[in-house]
Amino acid sequence: MKRDLVLVIDFGGQYNQLIARRVRECNVYCEVHPYNLSVDEIKQMNPKGIIFTGGPNSVYGENSPLCDKAIFELGVPIFGICYGSQLMSHILGGKVATAPVSEYGKTKVDVNIESKLFEGVSSSTICWMSHTDYIEKAPEEFKVIGNTPVCPVAAMECEDKNLYAVQFHPEVMHTEEGTKMLSNFVYNICGCTGDWKMDSFVEKTIEEVRQKVGNGKVLCALSGGVDSSVAAVLLSRAVGKQLTCVFVDHGLLRKNEGDEVEEIFGPNGQYDLNFIRVNAQERFYEKLAGIEEPEQKRKIIGEEFIRVFEEEAKKIGTVDYLVQGTIYPDVIESGLGKSAVIKSHHNVGGLPDYVDFKEIIEPLRLLFKDEVRKAGLELGIPEKLVFRQPFPGPGLGIRIIGEVTAEKVKIVQDADAIYREEIANAGIDKEIGQYFAALTNMRSVGVMGDERTYDYAIALRAVTTSDFMTAESADLPWEVLGKVTTRIVNEVKGVNRVMYDCTGKPPATIEFE
């Protein structure tokens, strides 16, 4: 049975993925496509609704992204957001101009609650504005259904044609009733049924993979991260022992993480698959000896991983399919819009060029990260793995500033384990987007037990974020930071100082290297 589809047409807005996530939270399937998607392509997709995103341009500017006017004649409900609202007005005969007063931040908007878009919404509601242009005059067929003191057309509708537009951003959390507005659009206006459920997705994908693979052999590079783990379990459910997972332990994992991965996926684990663990720690340390530049470290770790994986793949022999944990943000960012679960060979991550196989299987390519976690829970994967903290591909190699050595790896592993343990003990682990300890390349003088020390400084990092594109430093309780600091300097040999990084992103990145 074909599911309902809402298309998000991307005009360059920073929140395009967030819009799609919010729609999916309403249990409606949603895809993001570029603004130059043709009307014929849209017809073939047969969407129940279309959402135009925001964007940084002015609709009257040269080379600004526009859309075909024919899209408004398809009879499909359309919801324009910010730039998308201005675009709708501009193409249909309204007037868009530079606003006398720009609006940015939380703004009280008066709305007409008789509109289907604002059913169940307060007549005066807090919304997030971010615009320098505005709709000075709505198109003739449109009715104004929202305004602020300086924005006469904060929302408008043409109910007969199911066209709706708002100047604010209903998708961001600062718009207090934004989720309700999006729900009204997909249900009250588009007539969606809410058929996007994770249990049905998992069942359908397992059956698709089973039919495709048949008796073929499948190979998966298992990192122990959320994406590759969920992909591996899903494939295991579909084809069992036809799947071989290769886990390369490069010695740059968090404390005990390699053993935890083997405990879950290895011979004594709960999954029906073949598991190979390659202990390549010394090999990676040798390659990284004397290397301090971050990008060079990344490159060495990536290339060596491919070499190790290639060697193991050759031992297995020819495989029919290679599994990759590609998720939907990767698809959007690569400009690929098609939604097939299994597709032909293309190079993602370097591995396909070095392994002999027929096709790639990407079972998670329709899912956002939060949906991957939901799929993991649906598959019965332990919560400690499903909600594992994000971890970079190069591992601790980029959480050790400067040269990587076995001694430094142990220091940062021990410090990070203490930090994660105390965050969990305080019950705030689910409130923080990402948190970890890093080893600086700085040594400082200290005093411990009446003895002078000259040891390393550990930097603690914790951020809150909804999308990892921007982030703010987490306001951790001093009591927690104090306990973490005391434990690290007392329990981790080679450390006499602990610092907390208060920098946001931007200007800093979340990782140190």
Swiss-Prot record:
Residue ranges annotated for the GMPS ATP-PPase domain, each copy included: 196-388
Glutamine amidotransferase type-1 domain span: 5-195
Binding site for ATP: S223, G224, G225, V226, D227, S228, S229
GO cellular component: cytosol
Protein's UniProt keywords contain Repeat: no
Its EC number(s): 6.3.5.2
InterPro entries for this protein: Class_I_gatase-like, GATASE, GMP_synth_C, GMP_synth_GATase, GMP_synthase, GMPS_ATP_PPase_dom, Rossmann-like_a/b/a_fold
The organism's place on the tree of life at top rank: Bacteria
Keyword vocabulary terms for this entry: ATP-binding, Glutamine amidotransferase, GMP biosynthesis, Ligase, Nucleotide-binding, Purine biosynthesis
A GO MF term: GMP synthase activity
PROSITE patterns: GATASE_TYPE_1 (PS51273), GMPS_ATP_PPASE (PS51553)
Catalyses which reaction(s): XMP + L-glutamine + ATP + H2O = GMP + L-glutamate + AMP + diphosphate + 2 H(+)
Active site (UniProt): C82, H169, E171
Keyword Nucleotide-binding found: yes
HAMAP family listed in its UniProt record: GMP_synthase
Subunit comment: Homodimer.
Functional summary from the UniProt entry: Catalyzes the synthesis of GMP from XMP.
Name of the protein: GMP synthase [glutamine-hydrolyzing]
Gene: guaA
